[in-house]
């Protein structure tokens, strides 16, 4: 049809928004570094984002990864170099080793789930919470800090933080972990478009290419280009 012959950016105006699953944790520096370009991409292609906060320590343990403290010193040192490179590349100004990091992200990630559960937009909170960790060195394991961040985002902070500690939110958090494993996601950020995983904020440009071209998703057995 006519819509199918148009550029993908124009096509998006003729149909329901494409969906993308966004697996992340507020604990992750890479999710923070990639968040602004990801949001820009979402706007450009009119994507519907399915936000999936996930507990990284569990995801790592089940997929062969290691938390930072258990990695070889060579890998730890290289990570600091990469953070500096991407800090410059993305035009950011953040601490490589912020005072209150690492932290238990269950409550902070749970606030995002609670926001979604309430039918609200998590973006205003995320756009405050990410820099709160990496630029302002705030403690996102502290309930009062989370309440203020949510309030500043125009959200009911106290109610959301209370809800974040509930069994229902914990169950949703666990379900996100299982969904991540089922999707083939093993770190943060993980972007899943039509079943194709893009791991890491340094894959955003490749995600852009996939959206721009309108190509079929690639698979691990090389069938991405085959016709139906």
Give residue spans per PLM region.
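Short, Lys/Arg-enriched N-terminal segments with co-localized hydrophobic residues
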Residues: 1-15
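Short, charged low-complexity linear motifs
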Residues: 8-10, 111, 115, 177-180
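Structural alpha/beta surface segment adjacent to cysteine/selenocysteine redox centers
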Residues: 26, 32-133, 218-225
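Generic detector of short, locally flexible boundary/turn motifs and exposed helical patches
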Residues: 15-17, 59-62, 76-78, 90, ...
């Amino acid at each position: 049809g006519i819509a199918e012959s148009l550029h993908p950016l124009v096509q998006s105006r003729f149909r329901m928004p494409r969906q993308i699953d966004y697996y992340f944790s507020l604990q992750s520096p890479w999710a923070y570094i990639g968040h602004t370009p990801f949001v820009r991409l979402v706007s450009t292609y009119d994507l519907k984002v399915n936000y999936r906060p996930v507990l990284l320590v569990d995801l790592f343990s089940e997929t062969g990864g290691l938390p930072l403290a258990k990695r070889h010193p060579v890998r730890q040192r290289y990570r600091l170099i990469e953070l500096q490179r991407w800090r410059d590349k993305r035009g950011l100004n953040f601490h490589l080793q912020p005072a209150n990091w690492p932290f238990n992200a269950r409550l902070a990630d749970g606030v995002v789930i609670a926001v979604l559960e309430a039918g609200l937009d998590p973006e205003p909170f995320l756009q405050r919470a990410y820099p709160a960790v990496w630029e302002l060195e705030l403690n996102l394991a502290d309930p009062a800090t989370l309440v203020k961040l949510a309030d500043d985002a125009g959200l009911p902070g106290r109610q959301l933080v209370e809800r974040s500690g509930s069994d229902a939110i914990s169950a949703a958090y666990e379900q996100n972990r299982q969904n991540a494993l089922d999707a083939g996601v093993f770190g943060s950020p993980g972007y899943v478009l039509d079943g194709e995983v893009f791991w890491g904020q340094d894959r955003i440009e490749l995600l852009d290419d996939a959206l721009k071209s309108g190509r079929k998703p690639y698979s691990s057995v090389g069938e991405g280009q085959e016709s139906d």
